[in-house]
Amino acid sequence: MCIRDSHSTKKISTLLTRYVIGADGAKSNVARNTIKDAHKIPYVIAYHEIIEAPRETSEYNPDRCDVIYNGDISPDFYGWVFPHGKSASVGMGTGLNSVNLKKATSALRTQAGLDKCSTIRKEGAPIPLKPLERWDNGDNVVLAGDAAGVVAPSSGEGIYYAMIGGKYAADAVEKCLLNGHSKYLTLARRNFMKEHKAVFQVLGAMQNAYYRSDDRRERFVTLCKDIDVQRITFESYMHKKLSRSRPIAHLKIMFKNIAHLTGMVKAT
């Protein structure tokens, strides 16, 4: 049985289904009620304010996305200013309950020269930091998107992974229907992780290494100035796979990481 709430009429209806794809977001009700230990993954709480975008200023560029690594804004994640034409998103994320998200976002708006802009709306949502260990209940439920925890560490990107995760979930359900067996639900997670596990592991290791203090974040920003880092990151981001090209560049980046993580060099 699947309960659907029609928001336009507030009518609640009951649907009889053979399978349910739980795509109801982070901290999913479907996952919590059907998948063991679904609630036991870490989250970052993201908060942003959609504002009326100003004209271009010395601080605000409508053609540039700003990512802010500053412990005063977020001690364990990052803040952002993302232009969207006539509006802009200004926000931050954190996994610490002690951080006042609205106060931090207000400070970011002031810092970015956007405190006088009109606020259109305010929104907040949890962002999962790692994929769930299990996406199905072995019977009639499989998860997709944020409900399955497929948000990339470090960046918080989830749209692409939600779309491809939804496809894998749909493919798994289709195979179950064609073969009359629920065992194929496991294919959703298996196929997703086969394709994207390496990227999630690298991004998770990067977040654990560099997001823990202002000094580490400054070192991360210094690394990002390296042209090889920029090129390899761009290739990996666009193709959603770790770039295997230019092995010498990978070796150089590895040694730079070691130098920064051991304190052999200073952040610049």
Show which residues each predicted segment covers.
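Generic detection of short hydrophobic beta-strand segments and adjacent strand-loop junctions
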Residues: T14-L15, I127, I227
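FAD/FMN-dependent oxidoreductases across multiple families
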Residues: L96-L178
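C-terminal helical "tail/cap" subdomain of flavin- and related membrane-associated enzymes
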Residues: E174-T268
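Electropositive phosphate-/nucleotide-binding environments in soluble metabolic enzymes
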Residues: I41, G71, P75, S98-V99, ...
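Predominantly flavin-linked oxidoreductase catalytic cores and closely associated redox partners
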Residues: R4-K116, E133, G149
